[in-house]
């Protein structure tokens, strides 16, 4: 009788352990999924993988005679009624030369909207050598109805691009931006990325 009574208790403990293991697995997978995006972003920023550009705080001390053609692409994801485009479609700086270009963004909706620009460089091998000193993509951007901003990007191409086997034959790179809608409170941070107000339509 004692053995029969102990069997259900043992089975209950085993079932409890199985449930605990399953819950631990589910929570563990959830935590890994949550961490995967920021970890992947950090990996791309460090390695330049997938055309992710580098953020730097100082300019290049070496400027080569060779030039690099840089073209620009601007896109807006669904959810933002913005007109977003580069002021110049392409530039031809010397490799290592620090240069500033500008994009404009105009809110064509009747409400304040917030956006975050996501960027990449093609071909992907050039991403690690594309260094940004200043960029509106470093912060979120708020635009009031009818408001238009002029947003600078300061960058240079690392001279090491001509020495690397995978990138030495690259002569044209494309810097591409896509603005995505961003939810949240509306701080006074529109100009933190260097944006300048151009006009406000009443």
From Swiss-Prot:
Residue numbers on the Cytoplasmic membrane side: 1-13
Gene Ontology biological-process entries: respiratory chain complex IV assembly
Family the entry assigns: Belongs to the COX11/CtaG family.
GO cellular component terms, A-Z: plasma membrane
Localization per record: Cell inner membrane
Pfam families associated with the record: CtaG_Cox11
Stretches the record annotates as Disordered: 183-202
Organism listed in the record: Rhizobium etli (strain CIAT 652)
Periplasmic side: 37-202
Function per UniProt: Exerts its effect at some terminal stage of cytochrome c oxidase synthesis, probably by being involved in the insertion of the copper B into subunit I.
Transmembrane segments: 14-36
Mode of membrane association: Single-pass type II membrane protein
Name this protein carries in UniProt: Cytochrome c oxidase assembly protein CtaG
A GO MF label: copper ion binding
Main subcellular location: membrane
Keyword terms of this UniProt record: Cell inner membrane, Cell membrane, Copper, Membrane, Signal-anchor, Transmembrane, Transmembrane helix
Domain of life: Bacteria
Disulfide bonds listed in the record: none
């Amino acid at each position: 009788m004692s053995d029969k009574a102990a069997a259900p208790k043992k089975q209950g403990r085993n079932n409890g352990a199985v449930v605990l293991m399953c819950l631990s697995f589910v929570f563990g997978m959830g935590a890994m999924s949550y961490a995967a995006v920021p970890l992947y972003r950090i990996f791309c920023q460090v390695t330049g993988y997938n055309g992710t550009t580098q953020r730097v705080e100082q300019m290049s001390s070496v400027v080569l005679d060779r030039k690099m053609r840089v073209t620009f692409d601007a896109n807006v994801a669904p959810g933002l009624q913005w007109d977003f485009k580069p002021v110049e479609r392409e530039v031809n700086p010397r490799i290592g030369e620090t240069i500033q270009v500008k994009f404009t963004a105009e809110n064509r909706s009747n409400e304040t909207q917030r956006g975050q620009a996501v960027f990449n460089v093609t071909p992907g091998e050039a991403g690690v050598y594309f260094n940004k000193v200043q960029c509106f993509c470093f912060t979120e951007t708020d635009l009031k109805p009818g408001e238009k901003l002029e947003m600078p990007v300061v960058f240079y191409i690392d001279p090491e691009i001509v020495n690397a086997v995978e990138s030495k034959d690259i002569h044209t790179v494309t810097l591409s931006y896509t603005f995505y809608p961003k939810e949240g409170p509306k701080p006074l941070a529109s100009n933190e990325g260097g944006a300048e107000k151009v006009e406000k339509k009443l």
